[in-house]
Amino acid sequence: IRCQTEALAKPLSPEDQQVQSIPDVSPTKWHLAHTSWFYETFLLLPNLPDYTVFDENFGFLFNSYYEAVGPRQLRAERGLVTRPALAQISCWSALALNEACCMVNRGGKVCLAAFHPNRCPST
């Protein structure tokens, strides 16, 4: 499903992926980041003791409705989030997905050698 989502988003420019057409529909860029935040928060952090959060600010920006995890950006205002840039979200997404898949394929064993936030562009 993740590959299909990325394929659908690929022809869109970064500006296209920023648009929030109505308050109840989140931007494409936000959806890509939210999935990565979900993997990081609920799969990687609880299961990999050496895992480091990619960016502490992303929890607020990309949490959808998990109030027990912390505060969040209002849904109607997600289109106002211009940073991080799409390139950084794409890199973070690839790294988080790689780590999640590696962890699942290895039965929960750590694969952190492939994951390093410094490999992604900064905003």
Question: PLM ranges: what are they?
Answer:
Residues 28-71:
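Conserved alpha-helical segments that form or flank metal/cofactor-binding pockets of metalloenzymes
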Residues 1-11, 33, 37, 91-94:
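Alpha-helical bundle segments that constitute or directly flank the non-heme di-iron/ferroxidase center
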Residues 17-37, 80-89, 110-123:
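Alpha-helical scaffold segments that form or flank carboxylate-/histidine-based iron centers
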Residues 64-111, 118-121:
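Acidic/histidine-rich alpha-helical segments that form the ligand environment
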Residues 16, 21, 47-48, 58, ...:
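Solvent-exposed, flexible loop/coil residues
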